[in-house]
């Protein structure tokens, strides 16, 4: 009997609660963060129309100019920004070059001429205030190396392999890592005199400074024969990547005079090296 009265006494309370409005959810304060990318030092022609902003692994494709994000106040944020670069993928602020499409002896050989990569990283440990701003200084992360050989015979095609090349770079620190073979196709052009010029182009994230940087060039000649050129470029690459300008190296020896290797390389428009 007591149990029955207790049950009946609950009915009015349940009915009354069902008519009450639920409380509004608590909303955390927000900060409007304005992000600006600083392209100082980057040639106008190299500046892309769009790039990627990554905030705590949330990725946005944005255009140049100021971009505003509504973020939770009093939170920490890891922010990276980088350009789209062919044959380069970026995960957890690590940029990595894809594997070579040309089959060589090393199964882990990388593409020696990926797209040009610019990027940067910043961190906000405690975002405060109704509004805030952050400027991201974009840095050039790839560097060009061009090796040229004078050509007095006809070449149909070719490719080259450079040892001791970095396969990745950390956007947080700017430090490159890895030591792989990089593979690139040879470029054959005709100059104003009607002569062929052979250029071996590389675009690299960096070099393994402890490795020997041997360049091997494989050429298919028009007469059906082939030629392999092996040379050590280590001494010429000791300061590679310290400036944004390309490093251009040329040989003063004609192709027909090269038996197996080249010793008298000259650095062109990038400093002076005594040979």
Model-derived regions: residue spans:
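Structural motif
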Residues: 34-48, 148-155
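Tryptophan-paired
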Residues: 47-96, 157-238
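Structured interaction patches on ligand/partner-binding surfaces of diverse proteins
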Residues: 87-133, 223-256
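Conserved "repeat-terminator" motif of extracellular CCP/Sushi domains
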Residues: 26-28, 135-142
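Bacterial Sec-dependent N-terminal signal peptides
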Residues: 5-41, 266-268
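Short, low-complexity, Pro/Ser/Thr/Gly-rich segments in the mature regions of secreted, periplasmic
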Residues: 185-189, 201-202, 260-275
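Beta-strand secondary-structure signal
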Residues: 32-36, 78-80, 133-135, 144-148, ...
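Short, surface-exposed binding/anchoring microloops in extracellular/periplasmic proteins
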Residues: 139-161, 165
């Amino acid at each position: 009997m007591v149990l029955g009265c207790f049950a009946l006494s609950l009915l009015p309370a349940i009915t009354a609660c069902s008519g009450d409005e639920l409380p509004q959810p608590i909303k955390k304060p927000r900060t409007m963060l304005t992000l600006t990318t600083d392209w100082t030092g980057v040639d106008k022609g190299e500046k892309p129309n769009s790039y990627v902003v990554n905030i705590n692994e949330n990725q946005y494709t944005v255009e140049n100019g100021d971009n505003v994000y509504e973020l939770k106040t009093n939170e920490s944020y890891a922010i990276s920004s980088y350009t789209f670069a062919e044959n380069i993928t970026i995960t957890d602020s690590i940029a990595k070059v894809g594997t070579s499409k040309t089959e060589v002896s090393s199964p882990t050989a990388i593409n020696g001429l990926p797209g040009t990569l610019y990027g940067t990283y910043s961190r906000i440990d405690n975002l405060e205030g109704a509004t805030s701003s952050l400027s991201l200084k974009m840095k050039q992360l790839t560097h060009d190396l061009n090796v040229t050989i004078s050509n007095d015979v006809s070449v149909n095609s070719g490719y080259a392999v450079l040892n001791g090349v970095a396969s990745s770079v950390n956007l947080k620190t700017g430090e490159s890592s890895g030591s792989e073979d990089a593979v690139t196709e040879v470029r054959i052009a005709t100059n104003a005199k009607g002569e062929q010029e052979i250029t071996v182009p590389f675009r690299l994230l960096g070099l393994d400074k402890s490795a020997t940087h041997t360049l091997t060039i494989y050429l298919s000649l028009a007469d059906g024969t082939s030629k392999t050129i092996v040379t050590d470029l280590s001494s010429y690459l000791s300061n590679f990547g310290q400036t944004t300008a390309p490093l251009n190296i040329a040989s003063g020896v004609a192709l027909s005079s090269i038996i197996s290797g080249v010793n008298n390389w000259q650095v062109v428009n990038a400093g002076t090296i005594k040979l």
